[in-house]
C-alpha cells in the first residue's frame, strides 16, 4: 500500500480544503497521514481511516521553532518512509520540503496556494521570498491552484515552467455541487434572510473570509460608505489582526445597523444564497474559492483584478473586476452592478462553477 502524507501549518487548512480528497484516497487503497497542529475537531472530521499526527509548526519567523519543526518532521518522515509527501502553506512547505528531501522521499509535492511575500515589504518580503524559493527548490513538483499564480511564480523566478502544473482549471479542490446546491438557493435565501432580519427586497453585498487588511476590508468599508445607499453589507468570517484595519471605518461599521459582522459558519452555502453580490477585494490570493462557492449557488461577484481571483470568473458574465486597493473603483462597481442584470449573472456563475470546477471531475 502506497503511503501519502499531507502537511499543513494549522488544522483549518486541512478542514477547509482537503478532507474530501483525503477521505477519497484513504478509501481507495492508500495509507493517508495528516500532519499539523493538534485539533480535536480535525481528528473527528478525518474519521478512522486517515491517520492524524500532531506536530506544532510555527507561524511567522522563529529560528528556534523552525529548527524544532524540521527535526520533528525529519524524524517522523524517516520513521514512516512515505512514498509521497505533500505540503501546503509557506511555513509548512519550507520545513516539510527540507525534511522530506533529507530523508530521501522521492515524490515531494508543494501544493502552492498563494504567495505570502507579496503582502510584505522590505527585509520581511526578501526573507519570505527566499523561504518560498527554498521550498520550491527542495520539491520535486509544484502544483499551483491557479494558472495566473503559476505564471506569476515563473516570472518571479520561484520555479521553472517544467516543474509546475495546474490541475484542470485550478482551485484547491473544486466545489462540491451537492453541498453548494443551486437548486436550494431560494430556500436558503429565505431562511438566512429571516434569521438576519433582511427582507427579500433588501439588496445585500457580502464578504466571506478573514476580516483583515490584506483581504481588502478597509477598501470594502470605504466603498460601502461612499455609496451612501440603503443596501446591506454582510461580513462573514473571523476578525484577524484587527490593528491592521482602519479603526475609524471599522468602529463606524460596527455601529451601522445596515452592516452585520458575523462569525465564521459551517453552513456557508446558505449565507452565499442570502447575498446578492459577493465582494472579494483582496490584495493577494492563491485562487479565491469563495468566488466559485458563491457562484455555484447563483451569487455573482466583484473581485480584485489580481492573480488568483481572475481565474475564478468569466469577466462581465459571472463577475466584475476592479483594481486592488481602489475604494472608489470598488464603490463604482458596487453601485453599477445593481443596475445590471445581476440575477442573470448569478445564473451564469452557477453554470460556470459547474462546468469548470466540479470537485467530482477534479
Where on the chain are the PLM-derived regions?
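Short, structured helix-loop element that forms part of the nucleotide-activated donor/catalytic region
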Residues: 42-46, 232-258
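Short His-centered aromatic/hydrophobic patch
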Residues: 87-93
